[in-house]
Amino acid sequence: MSSRKFFVGGNWKMNGDKESLGELIMTLNTASLNDETDVVCGAPSIYLDYARSKLDQRIGVAAQNCYKVPKGAFTGEISPAMIKDCGIDWVILGHSERRHVFGESDELIGQKVAHCLESDLGVIACIGEKLEEREAGTTEDVVFEQTKVIADNVKDWTRVVLAYEPVWAIGTGKTASPEQAQEVHEKLRGWLRANVSDAVADSVRIIYGGSVTGGNCKELAAQADVDGFLVGGASLKPEFVDIINARS
């Protein structure tokens, strides 16, 4: 087992209200969670303050997106400075829904990564291929290109978690098999070794996202290069506790 600390992020996406999220937070606050796992919940921006004020301090909070500058005439956007002002330490960037629903480019995501790290926010940087890309055999090309743009904008890797999320497995009920996940994670680590450094390759956590459940999390967590999860739908349910404790 690696020395990398297991990391589980919950991405609530555009879900929940104060009542339902309050119940979820109560479940997390009273659950027995593995001390050897970092836990971070990605709340909708309008509930960041609420989530931070209600969640136990051992659980981190992440924004689900932000913009690439500190302030200005960018209606509807939030900045890393605002996120920090709410006591939040993390942000999710480059999620496939940002890329494919909202048309965010690799370049924009890279600029956001750079600005967030300069602002002392931790970054959960997402990468992953679409179904047609996997079927065409271009998975490596796609994820390496996405990773390169992120890497070009990182000076300090200690605040970065890489999240591999095959787009065909997000919210579809299809999961990459433990072997498929391990294969891509291992290749990503190899890319970091060749293009960044041995130290970064050995220390950066590469987490898996895509229909992770209480039922499949233990087998995925047993893979050598799977250092945790970014969980969507299941992070809104009590089974999120089982996923957090996948390595217990």
Swiss-Prot record:
GO CC entries: cytosol
Subcellular location: Cytoplasm
GO molecular function: methylglyoxal synthase activity; protein homodimerization activity; triose-phosphate isomerase activity
Metabolic or biological pathway, per its Swiss-Prot or TrEMBL entry: Carbohydrate degradation; glycolysis; D-glyceraldehyde 3-phosphate from glycerone phosphate: step 1/1; Carbohydrate biosynthesis; gluconeogenesis
Residue sites binding substrate per the record: 11, 13
Task performed by this protein: Triosephosphate isomerase is an extremely efficient metabolic enzyme that catalyzes the interconversion between dihydroxyacetone phosphate (DHAP) and D-glyceraldehyde-3-phosphate (G3P) in glycolysis and gluconeogenesis. It is also responsible for the non-negligible production of methylglyoxal a reactive cytotoxic side-product that modifies and can alter proteins, DNA and lipids.
Family in the record: Belongs to the triosephosphate isomerase family.
Name of the protein: Triosephosphate isomerase A
Protein's organism: Danio rerio
Designated gene of the protein: tpi1a
